[in-house]
């Protein structure tokens, strides 16, 4: 990747991207349910286009089933995001959406989801709209 530290910085980029991506997928699935659409049919269509991602391919079913006891824990994501925020403060990068995502992860922790997979963001949305 480059000089010493480049790999760690690249991991930070990855975590920033995943945090936003998982929230987007959560919002999309919650919206589909709220709109009365079949989320499985929706994913079948959108997974063939620009919205497709590893997270969609590997997490949408467990999200819809309310299964969050697997994968990369919310507490670990928040630890990683704290490292990203410290680096952003140092290098002047702006992370407004990532800051918001971190607030959402904090809410998931308050729901008892500290050890849930990061896709637990979906549970936060469903709880807020009274669907859980």
Regions found by a protein language model. Give the residues of each.
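Helical "substrate-binding/catalytic lid" subdomain
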Residues: 6-128
